[in-house]
């Protein structure tokens, strides 16, 4: 320990220079605790406040669907090209190398399959385990307008309450019932309810008409789901339109890992999200990277 006689008086105190602490500018997140902001800053690039997430959590209800038969073979080579990985704790522990050094959004709801009612989910991960896995956020479905709406909202509330206690963001993922219309009115309702319950990030679907109203009416960042597999040019157009209309990023799965050139597709999506490239320019990049 330094002796008092060895301590030199400080001289450069910057007198007259106001103390600097740049504001956290991610939409709706400026008043969150430091730990939660720190995790969100790993998910959303602080230079753009946007993100490219790679979702490969589908097996929690679909099993080994096309493209996810072998995560170690099909998905692991993509890790370095994504900003964030979204997966289950089972896959994270068994296949994702800790040295991949990518922030993780951990799937935290489940307990059903494609053989049953998908809306009947429960919280499937303890917050302590999410912390143990060094997750940057937890994610759960919310099914507005379905038979199990109440339980899915309770799941979000539970994760939000526990997340606030530990500094862990919650991403609410808007599921859609079989008979629900995927339109602006529905997603405006679903995203706003999830945000009002305290979710710090919302994942939802892009719609061709009125998406800018969905994004404007949601007080926290929205990332869009990729949804079903589209031709690469169409998927890039969807990304561009979503970002242009207010989305803060994408969380894509099938449109990446079922692409004929997944790495090239990730690079093209990255160009749209972080460099504001239009779909045509991004598609040319895709073709170039595809070779």
UniProtKB/Swiss-Prot annotation:
Enzyme Commission code(s) on record: 2.3.1.245
Gene Ontology CC annotations of this record: cytoplasm
Family matches, as SUPFAM superfamilies: Aldolase (SSF51569)
Disulfide linkage: none
Catalysed reactions, semicolon-separated: dihydroxyacetone phosphate + acetyl-CoA = 3-hydroxy-2,4-dioxopentyl phosphate + CoA
One matching Pfam family: DeoC
Matches recorded under CDD domains: DhnA
Highest taxon above the source species: Bacteria
Keywords: Cytoplasm, Schiff base, Transferase
Location(s), subcellular: Cytoplasm
GO terms for MF: acyltransferase activity, transferring groups other than amino-acyl groups; fructose-bisphosphate aldolase activity
Transferase keyword on record: yes
Residues the record marks as active site: 203
Keyword Cell wall biogenesis/degradation: no
InterPro entries: Aldolase_TIM (IPR013785), DeoC/FbaB/LacD_aldolase (IPR002915), DeoC/FbaB_aldolase (IPR050456), FbaB-like (IPR041720), LsrF (IPR033673)
UniProt subunit comment: Homodecamer.
Record function comment: Involved in the degradation of phospho-AI-2, thereby terminating induction of the lsr operon and closing the AI-2 signaling cycle. Catalyzes the transfer of an acetyl moiety from 3-hydroxy-5-phosphonooxypentane-2,4-dione to CoA to form glycerone phosphate and acetyl-CoA.
Family that this chain belongs to: Belongs to the DeoC/FbaB aldolase family.
Protein name, as recorded: 3-hydroxy-5-phosphonooxypentane-2,4-dione thiolase
Taxonomic source organism: Yersinia enterocolitica serotype O:8 / biotype 1B (strain NCTC 13174 / 8081)
Biological classification of the source: Bacteria, Pseudomonadati, Pseudomonadota, Gammaproteobacteria, Enterobacterales
Gene name of this polypeptide: lsrF
